[in-house]
Amino acid sequence: MITKEQKQQIIATFGSKPNDTGSAEVQIALLDSRIKDLTEHFKANKKDFHSRRGLIAMVNQRKSLLEYLKRSNLESYKKLIEKLGLRK
């Protein structure tokens, strides 16, 4: 689970303003950190299928936000992908 401090750090890193929580970049970065946390959780809890459903929903939401960002602001999309290390 993301702590309040981690969330503030992500918002400060990816946001355009100090309280920018609604931009696509910040939402994608927050989803990415939650997805990474859940992935670690599943290494220890392989049969937690209820949480797996939530993980799949988060991955799909991140995917749709990335598609939106790619359509609307390609330069910002490329920077975000590079910072998060999503594409290989």
Swiss-Prot record:
Transmembrane segments: none annotated. GO terms for molecular function: rRNA binding; structural constituent of ribosome. PROSITE patterns: RIBOSOMAL_S15 (PS00362). Pfam families: Ribosomal_S15. It comes from the Bacteria. GO terms for cellular component: cytosolic small ribosomal subunit. Keywords: Ribonucleoprotein, Ribosomal protein, RNA-binding, rRNA-binding. Belongs to the universal ribosomal protein uS15 family. Part of the 30S ribosomal subunit. Forms a bridge to the 50S subunit in the 70S ribosome, contacting the 23S rRNA. This is Small ribosomal subunit protein uS15. The gene is rpsO.
